[in-house]
Each structure stands twice: as C-alpha cells, then as structure tokens.
C-alpha cells in the first residue's frame, strides 16, 4: 500500500517578493531557509516548506544539480508537493503508471532523496518527494 506522509511544500506566486516575505515572516513567524530574487523557501514546521515564487519567475524549466524542475506559473497552475516514504518510491512509480499518469520530470537531490513531478487534471504541478529535499532545521 502506498501512503502520503505529509505535505512537504506548497507554492504560491507573488508580485512583490519583499512585501510577501515580510508578510509571511511577520504574520506567521515563518523563517526563510533559502532563496533569491526569483523565489524564497520558508520553513513552516520541521517538515513543511512554503514557497514564494516571483510571478513570471518560473515560466522556464529550472536546471538544478540533480535534474530539471518543470515550469509552473501563476496563470492557474500551482505547484505543491507531498512527502512519501523513500521505501515506497517504486510503488508510487507503479501506481502512477497504473493510472496512466505521465511523469514529467525526476530530480535526484542526493542519495535516496528524490522528487518526481506530474500534472493534475487542471495542469497543476504535483511533486512526490522522499524525505530530505529541504533542510528544515
């Protein structure tokens, strides 16, 4: 049986990165763990990250050391990720194939730390990731 062990990350698009960062940090106490002019990753809990993307900043694929993060933008398509146990990686692959879900991309962040990406019926980018993608300490 496959299982979801939590929401690892949730993303939104913002027009003013600094204003949004101040809002989420001050209002909720989220701590910024990484980012640049294009994005910011905020720690929500020890196992949850809230991502802010500058509107238009994710229209092109993003090359990262372990692979490619597919494009996703603010015109209706959102991105969110679910954490899955590393031991269930193959079971999830099989489950997605069984339901004719095309995997758009995979990223190998580190040994046994992986993400796979696919689209939901509305085109939202869904990520399944094993633990360890984000250092939330």
Region locations from a protein language model:
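Glyoxalase I/VOC metalloenzyme domain signal
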Residues: 1-7, 14-33, 44-103, 119-137
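Specificity-determining recognition surfaces
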Residues: 106-108
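Short, small/polar residue-rich loop motifs at catalytic or cofactor-binding pockets
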Residues: 36, 111-113
